Amino acid sequence: MALTNADRAEIIAKFARAENDTGSPEVQVALLTAQINDLQGHFKAHKHDHHSRRGLIRMVNQRRKLLDYLNGKDHERYTALIGALGLRR
């Protein structure tokens, strides 16, 4: 099931660097991670949904690009974000 507006607002409030911050890499990565985790359950029930799997791979690649950018820009923020989201890298 897709993220609700309340879920999005909660994630944005948790990872925002300033009020009304929706564009920082931390917020974008957190939202992508929530969407990716949501799709994991979908694929357990629908193994042959290749069209949606392509969208999942695109989201994972976008998250990786944002994480690489953040790692090069500010390594401390990167490690804090990885720890907060429970991602391995």
Curated annotation (Swiss-Prot):
Keywords: Ribonucleoprotein, Ribosomal protein, RNA-binding, rRNA-binding. The lineage of its organism: Bacteria, Pseudomonadati, Pseudomonadota, Gammaproteobacteria, Moraxellales. The keyword rRNA-binding applies. The keyword rRNA-binding applies. This is Small ribosomal subunit protein uS15. It comes from the Bacteria. GO terms for molecular function: rRNA binding; structural constituent of ribosome. The gene is rpsO. One of the primary rRNA binding proteins, it binds directly to 16S rRNA where it helps nucleate assembly of the platform of the 30S subunit by binding and bridging several RNA helices of the 16S rRNA. One of its GO terms (cellular component) is cytosolic small ribosomal subunit. GO terms for biological process: translation. Belongs to the universal ribosomal protein uS15 family. InterPro entries: Ribosomal_uS15, Ribosomal_uS15_bac-type, uS15_NS1_RNA-bd_sf. It holds the Pfam family Ribosomal_S15. Part of the 30S ribosomal subunit. Forms a bridge to the 50S subunit in the 70S ribosome, contacting the 23S rRNA.
